[in-house]
Amino acid sequence: MKLGLCQMPVTASQQENHAAMRRYVRDATAAGCDLVVLPEMWCCPYSNAAFAEYAEPQGGETWCLLRDTAREYDIWLVAGSVPERDGDAIYNTCYVFDPQGAQRAKHRKVHLFDIDVAGGQRFFESDTLSPGQHYTLFDTPFGKVGVAICFDVRFAELFRILALEGAQLIVVPAAFNMTTGPAHWELLFRARALDNQCFLAGCAPARDETAGYVSYAHSLVCDPWGRVQAQAGAAPELLICDIDFAQVDAVRAQIPVLRARRTDLYQLKYEKDS
C-alpha cells in the first residue's frame, strides 16, 4: 500500500485550507497513493477560539468536501481532524472515507491536550472540546487500520487495544508544538510502533513560525521494528511511503510480544466497540 501524508500549511482562511487540501490529495493520487492522511486541525488555526468558530456538524460543508474529494480521486482518505459540533459539544474529530465517498469510521480524540509545561507550552483543549468515548479501527483491502489523534499517542493502553483488535497500521493526525515536538515526537511514534509491532504514521501541519500555535511538523512513518521509515522536515511536504503489511506478521513471528503477554498476571480490560 502506498501511503501519503499531507504536511500542508494551515491558515485562518477556511477557503484557502479547503483548496490546499484538495491540491495535496490530488498530488498524492497522481503519485499513486492508496491511502491519504491529512493533519490534525487542518482546516483552522490551532486555538480554542478557532475550534468554536470553525466547528461544523457531521454532514456540514467541510464533511461534504472531504466525502466528495475521496470519491473524486478514488482514494481512502483519513481526513486529519476538524472541529465537529454535536449539540452543545465540540469534538476534535477524524472522519475516514473510502474511495466511493462512504464514511467508514469516525474517531473523536479520546485524550484532550491539557498541559502546562514549566517554561514551555500551556494549552487546555478541555476549555472548548469534549473527549471521545471510543477507540477506532476500519478495514481496507490492504489491512486493518487504527486511528488516534495527537495526544492519544501518549497513552500506550489505547494503542495496545488497537493492536489486539488487529491494527497493522495506526494513523495519527497530530500537531505537536515546539516544546513537546523536539522532546517526544519521534520517541513516542517509534515506541508505539515497537510496543505493538505495527506501522505508525503521524501527519502534522507544516510549521508556520508566525502562527499563534507553532506546529513541530516532521510527519513520519515508523515500521514494526521501531525504525523511522520516512520523515518530513518542517516545510510543507507530501510524504509518500510504501507500507508492506507482511512486515507486521514477520516481526511478530520473530519476537512474539503480543502472544507472550502474561495475562494470568495482568490484563488490559476494555469494552469492545461494535
For each feature predicted by the language model, list its residue ranges.
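Short, acidic/polar
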Residues: E16-R26, R154-R160
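Short polar catalytic/cofactor-binding loops
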Residues: Q7-S13
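Active-site catalytic loop in hydrolytic enzyme cores
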Residues: R85-E165, M178-L187, Q254-V257
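CN hydrolase (nitrilase-like) catalytic-core segments centered on the catalytic cysteine
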Residues: Q58-V78, K144, V153-L239
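Cys-nucleophile CN-hydrolase/nitrilase-fold catalytic domain and related Cys-dependent amidase chemistry
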Residues: Q14-Q15, R23-K106, I115, F176-N196
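A short C-terminal boundary segment appended to hydrolase-like catalytic domains
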Residues: A246-S274
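Extreme N-terminal starter segment of soluble prokaryotic enzymes
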Residues: M1-G4
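Short beta-strand scaffold segments in enzyme catalytic cores
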Residues: A79-G80, T93-V96, T136-F138, S219-V221, ...
